[in-house]
Curated annotation (Swiss-Prot):
Organism: Chlamydia felis (strain Fe/C-56) (Chlamydophila felis)
InterPro entries recorded: 2Fe-2S_ferredoxin-like_sf (IPR036010), 2Fe-2S_ferredoxin-type (IPR001041), Beta-grasp_dom_sf (IPR012675), FAD-bd_FR_type (IPR017927), FNR_nucleotide-bd (IPR039261), NqrF (IPR010205), OxRdtase_FAD/NAD-bd (IPR001433), Riboflavin_synthase-like_b-brl (IPR017938)
Subunit structure: Composed of six subunits; NqrA, NqrB, NqrC, NqrD, NqrE and NqrF.
Domain 2Fe-2S ferredoxin-type: 41-133
Name by which UniProt lists this protein: Na(+)-translocating NADH-quinone reductase subunit F
Keyword Flavoprotein on entry: yes
Superkingdom of the organism of origin: Bacteria
Length: 431
């Protein structure tokens, strides 16, 4: 009976501990309500009274504008890394933060330029906002499918109203709004093929509770490049990678949260409603006859597909187009069949797949692990297979999108070959 008594004591102690924790949490929340006085603040935009918004104090300027129907772009989700949520505060600007000083010149800071994601609304402000952001809109869409196309990447397919099409351009992006939610990663198996389960099980990624049920309205928005091209409307597509915590002993760190936006998207099922806003973007196609080289890795597949399918299937471009796509293994490769068909149908399109870590089954199926143009890091394979053979590499346009290390390696490589930065179109959300 001794061990039963001990177990009983532990259970009672655990219950008491949980109750105390709940009481303390409640006290903290109530204290915040009482101590932090919330008051209305007016945001006057472009000196136009009709655009004035009244918001509650205490929130970020970015979330206040988003809640007011002004979809300021924030591709990084408000982490101050993309530097795209810039707003000019002509009256009422507080002292700049270090993130502002790292973004703007001294003169710009004096003029009132700030990152809206880092600016707290505490009083009335007069703002200058670009017209293109004021003209951005929001759409409600219905999830058609949300299947994994790689172990940690989903293809989110959404249908929007054909009566109100989204006027986006290839290379553009939309922001996805994230409501309060709670999810269990085991439920994600519903939209994940069994072939991807083993890696998730190996890293103990299933049965993880992600609780963002107290998420503040308008506080979470993340921009994602469109994988679709305009002719595919009213359907839009995204390739989205899950942001897991770092792994410790083959398990996600319990002290670091999962990505708020990507976890929400991974939880979506067919029939669910989502809200997108935009369109935004700077990494559009340069309309000239220069040959094109796409250097794409991982979930950068969105950016590459949107441009390439639009050029070939919609615009019937005769420009020379080469795609180098890097993945770990064939299981992680995205849109292979689609690109192989395009290569057969269009003599001006050339497709190169590079694997950095081919699996045993890949090699058994015929993948050449000894060919450095096929089994390598993408930037090295590209240099061996094409770049080093170009007589005038500066004559090409390079469209680059992928993980941070991929992007930095490509930029350094192209710089070594004398390619001007103006010839490189980088889609980088500051991840």
């Amino acid at each position: 009976m001794t061990w039963l008594s001990g177990l009983y004591f532990i259970s009672i102690a655990s219950l008491v501990f949980c109750v105390i924790g709940l009481i303390l949490s409640g006290v903290i929340l109530i204290s915040r309500k009482l101590l932090v006085k919330i008051h209305p603040c007016k945001l006057k935009i472009n000196n136009d009274d009709s655009l004035t918004k009244t918001v509650d104090s205490g929130h970020s300027l970015l979330s206040s504008l988003l809640d007011s129907g002004i979809p300021i772009p924030s591709p990084c989700g408000g982490k101050a890394t993309c530097k795209q949520c810039k707003v000019k505060i002509v009256k009422g600007a507080d002292q700049p933060l270090e993130t502002d000083r790292a973004t703007f010149s001294k003169r710009q800071l004096e003029q009132g330029w700030r990152l809206s994601c880092q600016t707290k609304v505490q009083h009335d402000m007069n703002l200058e906002i670009e017209e293109r952001y004021l003209n951005a809109s929001s759409w409600e869409g219905t999830v058609v499918s949300n299947d994994n196309v790689a172990t940690f990447i989903k293809e989110l397919v959404v249908s929007v109203s054909p009566e109100h099409p989204i006027p986006f351009k290839p290379g553009g992006y939309l922001q996805i709004s994230v409501p309060a939610y709670k999810t269990n990663t085991s439920d994600w198996k519903q939209t994940m093929a069994p072939e991807y389960h083993s890696d998730w099980e190996r890293f103990n990624l299933f049965n993880q509770i992600i609780d963002n049920s107290l998420l503040e309205s308008g506080s979470a928005n993340k921009a994602y490049s469109l994988a679709s091209y305009p002719a595919e409307l009213p359907v839009i597509k995204f390739n989205i990678r899950i942001a897991t915590p770092p792994f410790i002993n083959n398990a996600p760190s319990p002290n670091i949260p999962w990505g708020v936006c990507s976890s929400y998207i991974f939880s979506l099922k067919p029939g669910d409603k989502i809200t997108v806003s935009g369109p935004y973007g700077e990494s559009f196609m340069k309309e000239n006859n220069r040959p094109l080289i796409f250097l794409i890795g991982g979930a950068g597949s969105s950016f590459g597909r949107s441009h390439i399918l639009d050029l070939l299937l919609d615009k019937h471009s005769t420009r020379d187009i080469t795609l180098w796509y890097g993945a770990r293994s064939l299981k992680e490769n995205i849109y292979q069949e689609e690109y192989e068909k395009l290569e057969k149908d269009f003599p001006n399109f050339h497709y190169h797949l590079v694997l950095s870590e081919p699996l045993a089954e890949d090699i058994a199926s015929g993948w050449d692990k000894n060919d450095p143009e096929k089994t390598n890091f993408l930037f090295r394979a590209f240099e061996l297979g094409q770049l080093s053979k170009l007589s005038n590499p500066e004559d090409y346009l390079y469209y680059v999108c992928g993980p941070p290390l991929h992007n930095s390696s490509i930029l350094k490589l192209l710089d070594n070959y004398g390619v001007e930065r103006s010839s490189i179109i980088l889609d980088d959300f500051g991840n």
